[in-house]
C-alpha cells in the first residue's frame, strides 16, 4: 500500500482510495505524507476495527462509503510520525503494538475487534517497563513506563477520553 501511494503521489494522481483497516490506511499515509504532491485520500473501511474511518465519520457500510465518496468535500487531518512511520490515529510503546500486530487473521475473522481486546489484556499482564523521555511544550517526562499512547484524537478505541481534539496537538497517555 505504501509503494502504491508513493507512485500515486509521484504520478500526481488526483486521489488515492484505500480499502482496508487502520494498518493499511497508515501505510498509505506513510506513502504520501512527505511528498511534494499529496493526492486526496478516500478511505473505504475494510478492516476489523476501522477506528480511523469511525473517527472521520465515514460510513461503515462498504457500499455506503463508496456512494458517499466526494473529493469536492475534503478535510485535513492530523498525522503523526514516529521514526520513519506515519500514523493517523495512534502510536504506542509497550506490549500493546505487539499484541495488536500478533492477532491471528482467523481470530479477527471469528471474533472481530474482540480478538484485539483479548490479546491486549494478555499483553497488559506482562510487567515490561521501558525507559522513556517525552518532550512537550508543557514540560518533559523522563522515567519508566510500561505503556505510552500518543493519540491524534479524543477517542481511544471507541471511548471518548478527551474533549474535542482538532487543535493540531497529540494527546499522550
Question: Where do the language-model regions lie?
Answer:
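Polar, low-complexity loop segments and adjacent catalytic/binding residues used for recognizing
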Residues: 22
